[in-house]
């Protein structure tokens, strides 16, 4: 199915690109989230009239994401206290929800879907560098310090 992207989609294309995707991906994901429209003559003309508006909206979203990214980069190490054994192994683990809550409490709002833990949940005490992706083009590293709770 040929579509016109109305927003930048990771690994697919940028605003205004005409791409071919599987019809299920278009119907079930891209169309409901208004990230794309079917590529027909009427939609192509409608898109061209709205192009400036969509580009301005995308630029505003990117500027807001860069501002949040700068605020996240300016954070000192965020401390999370958790129960742990004598050798520093946690009783349980610290996942994306716990990290997002701690960063939000530190003053910068973050949702758990923006936190990336490629190696899985944190299971030990120590200092960790966590990637936070606030926009498809903006990502930053936040230092998380896991300490033993008293």
UniProtKB/Swiss-Prot annotation:
This is Large ribosomal subunit protein bL9. Pfam families: Ribosomal_L9_C, Ribosomal_L9_N. It comes from Psychromonas ingrahamii (strain DSM 17664 / CCUG 51855 / 37). GO terms for biological process: translation. The keyword NAD does not apply. Binds to the 23S rRNA. PANTHER family: 50S RIBOSOMAL PROTEIN L9. Belongs to the bacterial ribosomal protein bL9 family. Keywords: Ribonucleoprotein, Ribosomal protein, RNA-binding, rRNA-binding. InterPro entries: Ribosomal_bL9, Ribosomal_bL9/RNase_H1_N, Ribosomal_bL9_bac/chp, Ribosomal_bL9_C, Ribosomal_bL9_C_sf, Ribosomal_bL9_N, Ribosomal_bL9_N_sf. One of its GO terms (molecular function) is rRNA binding. PROSITE patterns: RIBOSOMAL_L9 (PS00651). It comes from the Bacteria.
